[in-house]
Amino acid sequence: MKSGRFIGVMSGTSLDGVDVVLATIDEHRVAQLASLSWPIPVSLKQAVLDICQGQQLTLSQFGQLDTQLGRLFADAVNALLKEQNLQARDIVAIGCHGQTVWHEPTGVAPHTLQIGDNNQIVARTGITVVGDFRRRDIALGGQGAPLVPAFHHALLAHPTERRMVLNIGGIANLSLLIPGQLVGGYDTGPGNMLMDAWIWRQAGKPYDKDAEWARAGKVILPLLQNMLSDPYFSQPAPKSTGREYFNYGWLERHLRHFPGVDPRDVQATLAELTAVTISEQVLLSGGCERLMVCGGGSRNPLLMARLAVLLLGTEVTTTDAVGISGDDMEALAFAWLAWRTLAGLPGNLPSVTGASQETVLGAIFPANS
Protein backbone atom coordinates (compact mmCIF):
# COMPACT_ATOMS: atom_id res chain seq x y z
CA MET A 1 0.00 0.00 0.00
CA LYS A 2 1.45 3.35 -1.08
CA SER A 3 2.29 5.71 1.77
CA GLY A 4 4.45 8.77 2.12
CA ARG A 5 4.19 12.40 1.06
CA PHE A 6 1.23 13.41 -1.08
CA ILE A 7 0.17 16.78 -2.47
CA GLY A 8 -3.45 17.86 -2.83
CA VAL A 9 -4.49 20.58 -5.28
CA MET A 10 -7.89 22.24 -5.14
CA SER A 11 -9.38 25.07 -7.14
CA GLY A 12 -12.96 25.36 -6.02
CA THR A 13 -16.08 27.12 -7.18
CA SER A 14 -15.06 30.23 -5.22
CA LEU A 15 -12.11 30.77 -7.61
CA ASP A 16 -10.30 32.55 -4.79
CA GLY A 17 -6.99 30.78 -5.46
CA VAL A 18 -5.38 27.38 -5.93
CA ASP A 19 -4.98 25.62 -2.59
CA VAL A 20 -1.99 23.27 -2.39
CA VAL A 21 -1.34 21.03 0.61
CA LEU A 22 1.55 18.71 1.48
CA ALA A 23 0.80 15.78 3.80
CA THR A 24 2.10 12.41 4.87
CA ILE A 25 -0.59 9.77 4.45
CA ASP A 26 -0.81 6.11 5.36
CA GLU A 27 -3.57 3.73 6.44
CA HIS A 28 -3.50 5.05 10.01
CA ARG A 29 -3.21 8.82 9.74
CA VAL A 30 -3.12 11.99 7.67
CA ALA A 31 -0.61 14.59 8.84
CA GLN A 32 -0.52 17.99 7.14
CA LEU A 33 3.01 19.34 6.69
CA ALA A 34 2.63 22.57 4.72
CA SER A 35 0.30 24.51 2.46
CA LEU A 36 0.08 27.57 0.26
CA SER A 37 -2.51 29.49 -1.73
CA TRP A 38 -1.53 30.33 -5.31
CA PRO A 39 -3.25 33.23 -7.09
CA ILE A 40 -5.42 32.71 -10.17
CA PRO A 41 -4.78 35.40 -12.82
CA VAL A 42 -7.81 37.62 -13.37
CA SER A 43 -8.01 36.64 -17.05
CA LEU A 44 -8.20 32.93 -16.20
CA LYS A 45 -10.72 33.53 -13.43
CA GLN A 46 -12.95 35.49 -15.79
CA ALA A 47 -12.69 32.82 -18.48
CA VAL A 48 -13.85 30.17 -16.00
CA LEU A 49 -16.69 32.39 -14.76
CA ASP A 50 -17.82 32.97 -18.35
CA ILE A 51 -17.91 29.30 -19.29
CA CYS A 52 -19.71 28.39 -16.05
CA GLN A 53 -22.47 30.83 -17.00
CA GLY A 54 -22.91 29.30 -20.44
CA GLN A 55 -20.69 31.48 -22.63
CA GLN A 56 -19.84 29.68 -25.84
CA LEU A 57 -16.18 28.87 -26.51
CA THR A 58 -14.55 27.48 -29.62
CA LEU A 59 -12.81 24.14 -29.20
CA SER A 60 -9.51 26.00 -29.56
CA GLN A 61 -10.40 28.39 -26.73
CA PHE A 62 -11.53 25.51 -24.54
CA GLY A 63 -8.32 23.59 -25.20
CA GLN A 64 -6.21 26.63 -24.37
CA LEU A 65 -8.06 27.13 -21.08
CA ASP A 66 -7.52 23.46 -20.19
CA THR A 67 -3.79 23.81 -20.85
CA GLN A 68 -3.45 27.13 -19.02
CA LEU A 69 -5.13 25.77 -15.92
CA GLY A 70 -2.92 22.67 -15.96
CA ARG A 71 0.15 24.89 -16.12
CA LEU A 72 -1.21 27.03 -13.29
CA PHE A 73 -1.70 23.98 -11.06
CA ALA A 74 1.83 22.80 -11.88
CA ASP A 75 3.25 26.22 -10.99
CA ALA A 76 1.46 26.08 -7.65
CA VAL A 77 2.86 22.62 -6.88
CA ASN A 78 6.38 23.64 -7.86
CA ALA A 79 6.15 26.71 -5.64
CA LEU A 80 5.29 24.51 -2.66
CA LEU A 81 8.13 22.09 -3.46
CA LYS A 82 10.59 24.98 -3.66
CA GLU A 83 9.32 26.48 -0.42
CA GLN A 84 9.74 23.12 1.36
CA ASN A 85 13.08 22.30 -0.32
CA LEU A 86 11.68 19.08 -1.78
CA GLN A 87 12.21 17.30 -5.09
CA ALA A 88 9.77 15.38 -7.29
CA ARG A 89 11.21 12.10 -6.03
CA ASP A 90 10.10 13.02 -2.49
CA ILE A 91 6.41 12.95 -3.45
CA VAL A 92 4.36 9.81 -4.09
CA ALA A 93 1.61 11.54 -6.06
CA ILE A 94 -0.49 14.66 -6.55
CA GLY A 95 -4.25 14.51 -6.13
CA CYS A 96 -5.67 17.23 -8.37
CA HIS A 97 -9.38 17.98 -8.38
CA GLY A 98 -9.23 20.28 -11.41
CA GLN A 99 -11.48 23.26 -12.05
CA THR A 100 -15.17 22.46 -12.33
CA VAL A 101 -16.71 24.28 -15.28
CA TRP A 102 -19.97 22.32 -15.49
CA HIS A 103 -21.80 19.88 -13.21
CA GLU A 104 -25.02 18.26 -14.43
CA PRO A 105 -25.44 14.91 -12.67
CA THR A 106 -29.05 14.31 -13.73
CA GLY A 107 -30.87 14.06 -17.04
CA VAL A 108 -30.49 11.93 -20.15
CA ALA A 109 -26.68 11.98 -20.13
CA PRO A 110 -25.42 12.94 -16.64
CA HIS A 111 -21.98 14.52 -16.65
CA THR A 112 -19.48 16.64 -14.79
CA LEU A 113 -16.47 18.42 -16.24
CA GLN A 114 -13.28 19.41 -14.44
CA ILE A 115 -10.49 20.91 -16.53
CA GLY A 116 -6.81 21.64 -16.02
CA ASP A 117 -4.78 19.18 -18.08
CA ASN A 118 -3.20 16.62 -15.73
CA ASN A 119 -0.62 15.79 -18.42
CA GLN A 120 0.70 19.33 -18.09
CA ILE A 121 1.08 18.84 -14.34
CA VAL A 122 3.00 15.58 -14.76
CA ALA A 123 5.25 17.06 -17.44
CA ARG A 124 6.05 20.19 -15.43
CA THR A 125 6.48 18.59 -11.99
CA GLY A 126 7.74 15.09 -12.76
CA ILE A 127 5.22 13.68 -10.26
CA THR A 128 2.45 11.14 -10.82
CA VAL A 129 -0.99 12.77 -10.79
CA VAL A 130 -4.35 11.31 -9.85
CA GLY A 131 -7.26 13.31 -11.26
CA ASP A 132 -10.75 13.09 -12.79
CA PHE A 133 -12.22 11.94 -9.48
CA ARG A 134 -15.92 12.52 -10.07
CA ARG A 135 -16.94 10.84 -13.32
CA ARG A 136 -16.73 7.20 -12.18
CA ASP A 137 -19.29 7.88 -9.48
CA ILE A 138 -21.60 9.53 -12.03
CA ALA A 139 -21.15 6.53 -14.36
CA LEU A 140 -22.47 4.38 -11.50
CA GLY A 141 -25.58 6.51 -11.11
CA GLY A 142 -24.27 8.87 -8.46
CA GLN A 143 -24.08 12.64 -8.22
CA GLY A 144 -20.28 12.67 -8.38
CA ALA A 145 -20.45 14.95 -5.35
CA PRO A 146 -19.83 15.63 -2.63
CA LEU A 147 -16.75 13.42 -2.26
CA VAL A 148 -15.26 15.04 0.83
CA PRO A 149 -17.68 13.42 3.37
CA ALA A 150 -15.67 10.18 3.14
CA PHE A 151 -12.59 12.12 4.26
CA HIS A 152 -14.52 13.93 6.98
CA HIS A 153 -15.71 10.58 8.28
CA ALA A 154 -12.20 9.13 8.31
CA LEU A 155 -10.77 12.07 10.25
CA LEU A 156 -13.56 13.62 12.28
CA ALA A 157 -16.25 11.05 13.12
CA HIS A 158 -16.87 10.40 16.83
CA PRO A 159 -18.23 7.17 18.35
CA THR A 160 -20.91 8.89 20.46
CA GLU A 161 -21.18 12.58 19.49
CA ARG A 162 -23.53 13.66 16.68
CA ARG A 163 -21.27 15.69 14.40
CA MET A 164 -21.63 17.45 11.09
CA VAL A 165 -18.93 19.07 8.98
CA LEU A 166 -19.88 22.08 6.90
CA ASN A 167 -17.68 23.23 4.05
CA ILE A 168 -18.55 26.75 2.90
CA GLY A 169 -16.79 27.29 -0.40
CA GLY A 170 -18.51 28.72 -3.45
CA ILE A 171 -21.12 26.04 -2.77
CA ALA A 172 -21.86 24.88 0.78
CA ASN A 173 -21.89 21.17 1.50
CA LEU A 174 -22.71 19.22 4.61
CA SER A 175 -21.29 15.93 5.90
CA LEU A 176 -23.46 14.01 8.37
CA LEU A 177 -21.38 12.02 10.85
CA ILE A 178 -24.05 10.47 13.07
CA PRO A 179 -23.11 7.45 15.24
CA GLY A 180 -24.92 4.29 14.16
CA GLN A 181 -25.95 5.72 10.77
CA LEU A 182 -24.49 5.62 7.29
CA VAL A 183 -22.47 8.71 6.43
CA GLY A 184 -24.60 11.32 4.67
CA GLY A 185 -23.76 14.45 2.75
CA TYR A 186 -24.96 16.82 0.05
CA ASP A 187 -24.72 20.37 -1.26
CA THR A 188 -27.05 22.69 0.66
CA GLY A 189 -26.84 25.46 -1.97
CA PRO A 190 -24.79 28.62 -2.42
CA GLY A 191 -22.01 29.27 0.05
CA ASN A 192 -19.82 32.26 -0.81
CA MET A 193 -20.59 32.19 -4.53
CA LEU A 194 -23.44 34.70 -4.74
CA MET A 195 -21.94 37.00 -2.11
CA ASP A 196 -18.63 37.09 -3.99
CA ALA A 197 -20.32 37.62 -7.36
CA TRP A 198 -22.38 40.52 -6.03
CA ILE A 199 -19.57 42.47 -4.37
CA TRP A 200 -17.32 41.87 -7.39
CA ARG A 201 -19.91 43.44 -9.70
CA GLN A 202 -20.83 46.26 -7.32
CA ALA A 203 -17.51 47.22 -5.73
CA GLY A 204 -14.77 45.41 -7.66
CA LYS A 205 -13.76 43.38 -4.60
CA PRO A 206 -13.16 39.63 -4.79
CA TYR A 207 -15.03 39.01 -1.53
CA ASP A 208 -16.66 40.83 1.38
CA LYS A 209 -13.75 41.00 3.82
CA ASP A 210 -14.91 40.48 7.41
CA ALA A 211 -18.49 40.80 6.08
CA GLU A 212 -18.13 44.59 6.20
CA TRP A 213 -20.63 45.21 3.41
CA ALA A 214 -23.14 42.67 4.65
CA ARG A 215 -22.99 43.97 8.21
CA ALA A 216 -23.62 47.51 6.93
CA GLY A 217 -26.84 46.36 5.23
CA LYS A 218 -30.21 45.01 6.26
CA VAL A 219 -31.84 41.78 5.13
CA ILE A 220 -34.54 42.34 2.49
CA LEU A 221 -37.08 39.77 3.68
CA PRO A 222 -39.22 39.65 0.50
CA LEU A 223 -36.08 39.08 -1.59
CA LEU A 224 -34.92 36.39 0.82
CA GLN A 225 -38.27 34.60 0.60
CA ASN A 226 -38.21 34.89 -3.18
CA MET A 227 -34.79 33.21 -3.35
CA LEU A 228 -35.74 30.55 -0.80
CA SER A 229 -38.57 29.45 -3.10
CA ASP A 230 -36.03 27.97 -5.53
CA PRO A 231 -36.86 24.25 -5.92
CA TYR A 232 -33.28 23.15 -5.23
CA PHE A 233 -33.65 23.94 -1.53
CA SER A 234 -36.60 21.55 -1.08
CA GLN A 235 -35.11 18.80 -3.27
CA PRO A 236 -34.27 15.67 -1.25
CA ALA A 237 -30.75 14.25 -1.02
CA PRO A 238 -28.67 13.00 -2.74
CA LYS A 239 -28.18 16.30 -4.51
CA SER A 240 -25.36 18.48 -5.73
CA THR A 241 -25.10 21.78 -7.55
CA GLY A 242 -22.62 24.37 -8.79
CA ARG A 243 -21.92 27.65 -10.49
CA GLU A 244 -23.75 26.57 -13.63
CA TYR A 245 -26.95 26.91 -11.54
CA PHE A 246 -26.31 29.37 -8.69
CA ASN A 247 -24.59 32.17 -10.58
CA TYR A 248 -24.94 35.89 -11.15
CA GLY A 249 -27.68 35.28 -13.71
CA TRP A 250 -29.70 33.43 -11.05
CA LEU A 251 -29.32 36.41 -8.73
CA GLU A 252 -30.29 38.89 -11.44
CA ARG A 253 -33.51 37.02 -12.14
CA HIS A 254 -34.55 37.41 -8.50
CA LEU A 255 -33.44 41.04 -8.28
CA ARG A 256 -35.66 42.06 -11.21
CA HIS A 257 -38.56 42.13 -8.78
CA PHE A 258 -36.70 44.50 -6.42
CA PRO A 259 -35.38 47.50 -8.38
CA GLY A 260 -33.39 50.25 -6.66
CA VAL A 261 -32.35 48.28 -3.59
CA ASP A 262 -29.23 49.24 -1.62
CA PRO A 263 -26.32 47.01 -2.72
CA ARG A 264 -25.31 46.48 0.91
CA ASP A 265 -28.81 45.24 1.72
CA VAL A 266 -28.48 42.70 -1.09
CA GLN A 267 -25.14 41.59 0.38
CA ALA A 268 -26.77 41.13 3.79
CA THR A 269 -29.62 39.18 2.21
CA LEU A 270 -27.24 36.85 0.38
CA ALA A 271 -25.37 36.13 3.60
CA GLU A 272 -28.68 35.34 5.28
CA LEU A 273 -29.64 33.06 2.37
CA THR A 274 -26.50 31.01 2.92
CA ALA A 275 -27.00 30.85 6.69
CA VAL A 276 -30.70 29.96 6.49
CA THR A 277 -30.35 27.27 3.82
CA ILE A 278 -27.51 25.63 5.76
CA SER A 279 -29.26 25.75 9.13
CA GLU A 280 -32.51 24.40 7.70
CA GLN A 281 -30.68 21.40 6.26
CA VAL A 282 -28.85 20.76 9.53
CA LEU A 283 -32.18 20.68 11.37
CA LEU A 284 -33.94 18.61 8.70
CA SER A 285 -31.13 16.06 9.00
CA GLY A 286 -31.83 15.64 12.71
CA GLY A 287 -29.47 18.25 14.10
CA CYS A 288 -26.11 17.70 15.71
CA GLU A 289 -24.17 18.42 18.87
CA ARG A 290 -21.20 19.92 17.04
CA LEU A 291 -21.04 21.65 13.65
CA MET A 292 -17.46 22.00 12.43
CA VAL A 293 -17.05 24.58 9.68
CA CYS A 294 -14.30 24.79 7.06
CA GLY A 295 -13.74 26.60 3.78
CA GLY A 296 -13.57 30.32 3.11
CA GLY A 297 -16.95 30.91 4.71
CA SER A 298 -15.57 29.82 8.08
CA ARG A 299 -13.66 33.15 8.06
CA ASN A 300 -16.88 35.14 7.59
CA PRO A 301 -17.83 36.45 11.06
CA LEU A 302 -21.41 37.25 10.07
CA LEU A 303 -22.05 33.77 8.67
CA MET A 304 -20.58 32.10 11.74
CA ALA A 305 -22.60 34.33 14.08
CA ARG A 306 -25.85 33.70 12.20
CA LEU A 307 -25.28 29.94 12.18
CA ALA A 308 -24.77 30.02 15.96
CA VAL A 309 -28.07 31.90 16.39
CA LEU A 310 -30.04 29.73 13.97
CA LEU A 311 -28.67 26.54 15.52
CA LEU A 312 -29.06 27.27 19.23
CA GLY A 313 -27.91 24.29 21.27
CA THR A 314 -25.32 23.28 18.68
CA GLU A 315 -21.64 24.02 19.21
CA VAL A 316 -20.62 25.88 16.04
CA THR A 317 -16.86 25.94 15.61
CA THR A 318 -14.24 25.67 12.88
CA THR A 319 -12.24 22.58 12.01
CA ASP A 320 -9.18 24.53 13.15
CA ALA A 321 -10.36 23.78 16.68
CA VAL A 322 -9.73 20.08 16.07
CA GLY A 323 -6.39 20.63 14.35
CA ILE A 324 -7.35 20.77 10.67
CA SER A 325 -7.06 24.09 8.87
CA GLY A 326 -10.39 25.14 7.45
CA ASP A 327 -8.61 26.70 4.49
CA ASP A 328 -6.87 23.46 3.51
CA MET A 329 -9.54 20.83 4.14
CA GLU A 330 -10.58 20.19 0.53
CA ALA A 331 -7.05 20.09 -0.88
CA LEU A 332 -6.10 17.70 1.92
CA ALA A 333 -9.11 15.54 1.03
CA PHE A 334 -7.95 15.15 -2.57
CA ALA A 335 -4.45 14.20 -1.44
CA TRP A 336 -6.14 11.49 0.64
CA LEU A 337 -8.33 10.41 -2.27
CA ALA A 338 -5.20 10.09 -4.43
CA TRP A 339 -3.70 7.82 -1.77
CA ARG A 340 -6.84 5.68 -1.78
CA THR A 341 -6.82 5.41 -5.57
CA LEU A 342 -3.19 4.25 -5.65
CA ALA A 343 -3.99 1.79 -2.85
CA GLY A 344 -6.93 0.40 -4.85
CA LEU A 345 -9.45 1.54 -2.23
CA PRO A 346 -12.89 3.04 -2.94
CA GLY A 347 -13.21 6.79 -2.54
CA ASN A 348 -16.94 7.39 -2.85
CA LEU A 349 -19.78 6.72 -0.42
CA PRO A 350 -23.01 5.55 -2.10
CA SER A 351 -24.95 6.76 0.95
CA VAL A 352 -23.78 10.26 0.04
CA THR A 353 -23.67 10.34 -3.76
CA GLY A 354 -26.37 7.81 -4.61
CA ALA A 355 -24.03 5.66 -6.71
CA SER A 356 -24.93 1.99 -7.11
CA GLN A 357 -21.71 0.83 -5.46
CA GLU A 358 -18.42 1.87 -3.93
CA THR A 359 -15.63 2.31 -6.45
CA VAL A 360 -12.02 3.35 -6.85
CA LEU A 361 -12.09 6.93 -8.13
CA GLY A 362 -9.99 8.83 -10.61
CA ALA A 363 -7.50 8.31 -13.38
CA ILE A 364 -3.76 7.90 -12.86
CA PHE A 365 -1.28 9.91 -14.96
CA PRO A 366 2.07 8.28 -14.19
CA ALA A 367 5.35 10.14 -14.20
CA ASN A 368 8.39 8.69 -15.92
CA SER A 369 10.16 6.37 -13.51
From Swiss-Prot:
Its recorded reaction(s) are: 1,6-anhydro-N-acetyl-beta-muramate + ATP + H2O = N-acetyl-D-muramate 6-phosphate + ADP + H(+)
As one GO molecular function, the record gives:
phosphotransferase activity, alcohol group as acceptor
What organism does the UniProt record list as the source?
A: Shigella flexneri
Q: Does the keyword Iron apply?
A: no
State the InterPro entries in the record. Anhydro_N_Ac-Mur_kinase (IPR005338), ATPase_NBD (IPR043129)
Q: Tell me which Gene3D superfamilies the record gives.
A: 3.30.420.40
Q: Species lineage, top-down?
A: Bacteria, Pseudomonadati, Pseudomonadota, Gammaproteobacteria, Enterobacterales
The biological pathway it contributes to is: Amino-sugar metabolism; 1,6-anhydro-N-acetylmuramate degradation; Cell wall biogenesis; peptidoglycan recycling
Keyword vocabulary terms for this entry: ATP-binding, Carbohydrate metabolism, Kinase, Nucleotide-binding, Transferase
Do you know which CDD domains this protein is assigned to? ASKHA_NBD_ANMK
| Name this protein carries in UniProt | Anhydro-N-acetylmuramic acid kinase
Primary enzyme class: transferase
